[in-house]
Amino acid sequence: MSPLAVNPPAPASTDPSVIRNFCIIAHIDHGKSTLADRMLQATGVVTPRQMKAQYLDRMDIERERGITIKSQAVRMPWNVDGTDYALNMIDTPGHVDFTYEVSRSLAACEATILLVDAAQGIEAQTLANLYLAIENDLTIIPVLNKIDLPAAQPEKYAAELANLIGVEPEEVLKVSGKTGEGVEELLERIVRDVPPPQGVKDAPSRAMIFDSVYDTYRGVVTYVRVVDGTLVPRERIQMMSTGATHELLEIGVISPEPIPSKGLSVGEVGYLITGVKDVRQSRVGDTVTNQQKPAQESLGGYEDPKPMVFSGLFPVEGSDYPVLRDALEKLQLNDAALVYEPETSAALGFGFRCGFLGLLHLEITRDRLEREFNLDLISTAPSVSYNVTLEDHSEVEVTNPSEFPEGRILEIREPMVSATILVPSEFIGAVMELSQSKRGEMKGMDYLSEDRVELRYRLPLAEIVFDFFDQLKSKTRGYASLDWKADGEQAADLVKVDILLQGEQVDAFSAITHKDKAYSYGVLMTGKLQKLIPRQQYEVPIQAAIGSRIIARENIRAIRKDVLSKCYGGDISRKRKLLEKQKEGKKRMKMVGRVEVPQEAFVAALSSDEDNGKDKKK
């Protein structure tokens, strides 16, 4: 067994040859955070008394859902053959929505641990992240986790993993994040196999930002990996993408609580505090350099996060609008990918149109708004961004059905995605049928082993954001896994379906759908609303329309008061007079009456698909 480090290398004066930077990539629920916990314990940076499960997942929502949303970086000392090493572990998010954060975390490392659950095998996101690691030329250490599970098949999956990355099955390490078995061997393997960082100590300083979090007391805490040169406290630094300059108030390492140091040198991973209050000023992927002696070239790879899915968020109580605005401002401090703008809806009042990276991002943001700020929210059906070309060749970007231009449209282009689906071979037929029903185009198919298949499809993003994942899981008994990335645009035959209540359009229920699906959407919504809207004194038609053409209709039957109850026998003309009078009254009421859609009907109509999905996931 390797003893704990005797003299842990001090930050700023650590020789790059004893630094090892690595990250852990895995599919959701394959045990990344649990393995990280065991490493923290084995290296002694967290005492048994301080230890708690998922130590690095700081947000309640991360711990509750068992997912990692924000990257974390921890410095751990470890001794091998009498030499003290500094291991920097970067814990990465595993979900498809946060692929950009994962790619930046990978760029900050020299190696990655490819972690696979010994009971489930390789999943789609494991593959996607593995390809990212290969693109970044990282050393890959294959590891099977959860070997203590009764259902574990370490031999079978070790062969599958070895086959995938081209090593011998004996080279695949077997560990248990729960019991700690094999963790010390893994730490020694990291020291032995991971190359030390390369960089020029005397060159102008360059450091890459791979994450930033907002701290209420200290402002933005930026996580960086130094590539060249040295960063020291009190120097003025410059962000290379924006040119903004700041004073470095504090610099240090996280082990696993922040420890200020005299600086950070080549290959080291740590944090900076500049007193900035907005995460958007220290963007993930940007390069930090010295203002006096700036580097000529940035480290590259920086992209602005681009929202893919749009949804309207409205407070159930209209008076909560200012609270929602403040809450979104605070969340944006911690989440540079969240964009929002004010929106008004005739039906739902004042709210915000928000842009998200994907459905999980939307769900987490909504959860955090409701939980941390005590808000009750209605979210409209998720939509994507369409590019519409009109006949005069002007272009309009549409993120909301209400912005859809009426009139002469030349072409509508919708965003497309490349999807990778991993499924057991017996479900191939069901998955192909589902993908084709969602307008998917098959790009290829590979057998990873006798019973696991990788299917590649090109699909419209709009078909994926609604309930594709839920349907995929239910058709494959939960065994399929999905990963996707943006893949350009494509012209499509799309129409806007409006829902009319007594001839008046209700903007919250409008949707942009493919022409072939417009009828089924119309029938679905009219049927749903017929059950949800209370009956009135007069008959109310609910119609679905494309432009001026009605494609579906349901009626809410009128409540009829028995006006003849007080007539005991008597003349028929008396009864007829009362009935005519009632008929006139209903006619007049129908002309002046307005149908109020109750709040519950909005919530049920807009979120029932989503809730069904949630039930399926449980």
UniProtKB/Swiss-Prot annotation:
GTP binds at D29, H30, G31, K32, S33, T34, N145, K146, I147, D148. The keyword Cell membrane applies. It is an enzyme of class 3 (hydrolase). It is a peripheral membrane protein. GO terms for molecular function: GTP binding; GTPase activity; ribosome binding; translation elongation factor activity. Its EC number is 3.6.5.n1. Belongs to the TRAFAC class translation factor GTPase superfamily. Classic translation factor GTPase family. LepA subfamily. This is Elongation factor 4. It comes from Kocuria rhizophila (strain ATCC 9341 / DSM 348 / NBRC 103217 / DC2201). The gene is lepA.
